[in-house]
């Protein structure tokens, strides 16, 4: 835990800018997560990013700030080479990568290496995450090259002008297409945090699904979310279709193997007319070809 008392020269500063000033290694995503998960308090009360702080306020941060590690990764040529291998689209304003499974997008209390730290290696640019993928989900991830385009792309996601298409292999046979429209909220089952479907509480979640082919005893599904709730596709497959995603240890009680078969296959940025497709991982293609035999 870090405790700081606001000095005179910081009076009137926004809370998020104050926290960012404490460490050059704090990325935008990590900063937002600190506030979202209530890890920052002002005078004992939960802080919001836009809160104004004043002389004498006590700021407590219930996390470790990854300063030294982040500074080592900024403008690191080896890390940039690693990032370049993932890039599948790039223009002057943003780029897209094919994120591998098992690599987290954002820093966390137990995550010290992730996409957020990799993009710091991009020479002479401050890059910004504009959306997220779960650690075990692979596929298209957009990254802005400046604040202006971070705001623009974030706005397009908010206004549903960026359409996402996922591919998943699920346990069970899905015979027809359909749309799931319900509500999702966080709950705790034992000591484990999970997202659960509810009738009319929580946040609305809408997913369109379509079976593409049988894969042995499984089904290759196309999933198109209209909303971006946490674990939305995983919960909808498990709870509403009764067909949890293969390898999903959180929502599939029969999960086996080391990979989750959920891939962000395609993004269409409608206002720009840009479509970006991410090739399936080898293990995903092998699962399809093996069970077709």
Located regions from the model:
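Short aromatic-glycine motifs in intrinsically disordered, low-complexity regions
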Residues: 191-200
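Hydrophobic residues embedded in beta-strands of well-ordered beta-sheets
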Residues: 94-95, 192-193, 219, 274
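Long C-terminal interaction/binding lobes of large macromolecular proteins
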Residues: 209
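PP2C/PPM family metal-dependent serine/threonine protein phosphatase catalytic domain
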Residues: 200-205, 251
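Pseudouridine synthase
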Residues: 111-115, 119, 147, 186, ...
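RNA pseudouridine synthases
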Residues: 1-190, 203, 214, 282-292
């Amino acid at each position: 835990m870090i405790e700081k008392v606001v000095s005179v020269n910081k009076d009137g500063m926004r809370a998020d800018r104050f926290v960012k000033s404490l460490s050059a290694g704090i990325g935008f995503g990590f900063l937002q997560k600190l506030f979202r998960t209530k890890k920052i308090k002002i005078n004992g009360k939960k802080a919001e990013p836009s809160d104004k702080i004043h002389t004498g306020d006590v700021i407590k941060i219930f996390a470790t700030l990854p300063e030294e590690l982040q500074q080592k990764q900024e403008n690191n040529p080896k890390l940039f080479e690693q990032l370049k291998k993932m890039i599948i689209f790039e223009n002057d304003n943003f780029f897209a990568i094919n994120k591998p499974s098992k690599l987290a997008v954002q820093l966390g209390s137990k995550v010290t290496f992730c996409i957020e730290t990799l993009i710091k290696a991009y020479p002479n640019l401050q890059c910004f995450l504009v959306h997220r993928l779960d650690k075990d989900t692979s596929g298209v991830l957009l990254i802005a090259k400046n604040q202006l385009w971070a705001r623009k792309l974030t706005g397009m996601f908010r206004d549903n002008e960026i359409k996402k298409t996922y591919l998943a292999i699920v346990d069970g046979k899905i015979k027809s297409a359909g749309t799931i429209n319900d509500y999702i909220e966080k709950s705790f089952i034992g000591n484990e945090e999970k997202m659960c479907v509810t009738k009319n509480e929580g946040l609305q979640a809408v997913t369109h699904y379509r079976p593409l082919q049988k894969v042995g005893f499984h089904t290759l599904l196309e999933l198109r979310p209209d909303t971006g709730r946490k674990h939305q596709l995983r919960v909808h497959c498990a709870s509403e279709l009764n067909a949890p995603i293969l390898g999903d240890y959180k929502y599939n009680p029969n999960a086996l193997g080391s990979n989750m078969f959920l891939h962000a296959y395609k993004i269409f940025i409608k206002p720009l007319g840009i479509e970006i497709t991410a090739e399936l991982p080898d293990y995903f293609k092998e699962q399809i070809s093996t069970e077709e035999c």
